[in-house]
């Protein structure tokens, strides 16, 4: 071969290699990025040419796809309940949204392969649709959510103008009955095929200082305040303490090796004597007594008990992503004293606090929380069913029974609206300081509990940020307890 021809051959070969390399790069290495690029209209057209499956709860459709006349064959919708026009907002923390421009969140994201029909378990269905010429359809997601409890949980927050969250769990199974967050948003606005409308809604939601897109039930952590005393008491009881043990009743206590003092609510003493029993200190939620109790119990026991309740453990069962809860570092007894009243670096999601209540209610057995009951094929045949998943005996049945008794005492000592006639609730309130100037910042108000105390059917956690409508005067009993009791009342209907 002469030199010019050789050069031409080499040039052609180099171009072929470059073409193959570029094709490989685009089709293999960059394939996922290109598929997920919202500007890729071919991907959008393909996704919207299939009827996406439904998300449902208690027989009610929370999300569905309807046919349209535009180039995108199906529109994702979140239909309102006839009795609750704001139900799409109530359900948004569960469903999330499915958007042409902004991807997806919630179950729309975590169960996307089932909903869009690409799940491996639906291969036979896809093949049948291809051979028969039928339009492809996605599978369905059946949730554990009780739509009545979910709506009540959201309405209790929304109607009062509260920013916060509610989680309700069935103690014996871990089924999540409600997961509400307020303020919320209408996912229909982000599912629109009108790009301008979707962009405007997105900008408004993201610029809102109240963060309506944030699922506060699982994506935010808060100091739990006195609700953490349930866990501290569990640690103490598991390590030999008794409800009759005497603790300081002083109005203030100085943390070891510091000049920092902590005080009881309103600077009051814990009863009329120099000491108070653990039972009385729990009912009155005395900070000084619990600083002493926590230090006497020890940091290792507190860490072990926190771990047994699932704190620090990744939550994969939901199946939504959940922020990590933590008790923080405890380098010395001063830190231990602060942590023992649910302050310092202790930070829990509302879901985690609900799990603590549910574990006590379930005789000390911790069940993994889950929100998907069943995955179905398009013809409603079963793909998988979520079975209750025990994560072990967090505390003994005896300790759980003692805690239940103490929580009954706390409920009976707590004011606020909404007490349910004929139903004994076991509960614990919390009023948690936060921020750089906690004494002048409205506290977060907490309420965790379960009912009926003698045969628990529902366990709940309520967080109301920044004192709700009570500002600096807020307490868990006055602000969060009425919300929690209303949710419990709804959850007990038919159970």
Positions of the model-derived regions?
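Periplasmic/cell-envelope proteins involved in peptidoglycan metabolism and beta-lactam response
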Residues: 1-197, 221-223, 300-308, 420, ...
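Beta-lactam-recognizing serine transpeptidase/beta-lactamase-like catalytic domain environment
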Residues: 176-226, 231-467, 476
């Amino acid at each position: 071969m002469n030199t010019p021809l050789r050069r031409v051959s080499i040039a052609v070969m180099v171009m072929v290699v470059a073409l193959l390399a570029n094709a490989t790069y685009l089709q293999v290495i960059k394939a996922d990025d290109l598929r997920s690029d919202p500007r890729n209209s071919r991907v959008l057209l393909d996704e919207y040419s299939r009827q996406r499956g439904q998300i449902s709860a208690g027989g009610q459709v929370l999300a569905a796809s309807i046919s349209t006349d535009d180039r995108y064959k199906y529109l994702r919708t979140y239909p309102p309940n006839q009795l609750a026009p704001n139900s799409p907002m109530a359900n948004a923390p569960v469903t999330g949204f499915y958007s042409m421009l902004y991807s997806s969140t919630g179950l729309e994201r975590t169960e996307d392969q089932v909903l869009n029909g690409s799940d491996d378990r639906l291969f036979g269905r896809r093949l049948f649709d291809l051979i028969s010429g039928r339009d492809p359809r996605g599978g369905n997601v059946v949730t554990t959510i009780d739509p009545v409890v979910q709506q009540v949980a959201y309405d209790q927050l929304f109607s009062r103008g509260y920013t916060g969250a509610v989680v309700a769990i069935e103690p014996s199974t871990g089924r999540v009955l409600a997961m509400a967050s307020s303020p919320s948003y209408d996912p229909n606005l982000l599912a629109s095929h009108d790009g301008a409308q979707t962009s405007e809604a997105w900008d408004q939601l993201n610029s809102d200082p109240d963060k309506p897109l944030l699922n506060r039930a699982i994506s935010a952590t808060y100091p739990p305040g006195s609700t953490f005393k349930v866990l501290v008491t569990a640690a103490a009881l598991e390590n030999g303490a008794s409800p009759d043990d005497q603790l300081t009743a002083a109005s203030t206590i100085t943390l070891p090796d510091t000049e920092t003092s902590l005080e009881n609510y309103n600077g009051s003493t814990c009863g009329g004597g120099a000491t108070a029993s653990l039972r009385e200190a729990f009912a009155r939620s005395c900070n000084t007594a619990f600083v002493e109790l926590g230090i006497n119990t020890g940091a290792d026991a507190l860490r072990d008990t926190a771990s047994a309740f699932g704190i620090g453990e990744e939550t994969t069962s939901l199946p939504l992503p959940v922020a990590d809860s933590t008790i923080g570092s405890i380098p010395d007894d001063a830190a231990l004293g602060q942590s023992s009243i649910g302050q310092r670096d202790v930070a829990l999601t509302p879901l985690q606090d609900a799990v603590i209540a549910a574990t006590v209610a379930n005789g000390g057995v911790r069940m993994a929380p889950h929100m998907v009951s069943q995955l179905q094929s398009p013809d409603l045949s079963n793909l998988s069913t979520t079975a209750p998943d025990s994560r072990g005996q967090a505390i003994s049945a005896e300790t759980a029974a003692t805690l239940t008794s103490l929580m009954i005492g706390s409920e009976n000592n707590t004011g606020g609206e909404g007490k349910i006639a004929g139903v004994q609730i076991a509960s614990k309130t919390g009023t948690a300081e936060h921020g750089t100037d906690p004494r002048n910042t409205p506290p977060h108000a907490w309420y965790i509990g379960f009912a009926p105390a003698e045969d628990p059917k529902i366990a709940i956690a309520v967080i109301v940020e920044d004192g709700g409508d009570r500002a600096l005067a807020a307490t868990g009993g006055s602000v969060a307890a009425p919300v929690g009791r209303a949710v419990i009342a709804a959850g007990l209907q038919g159970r």
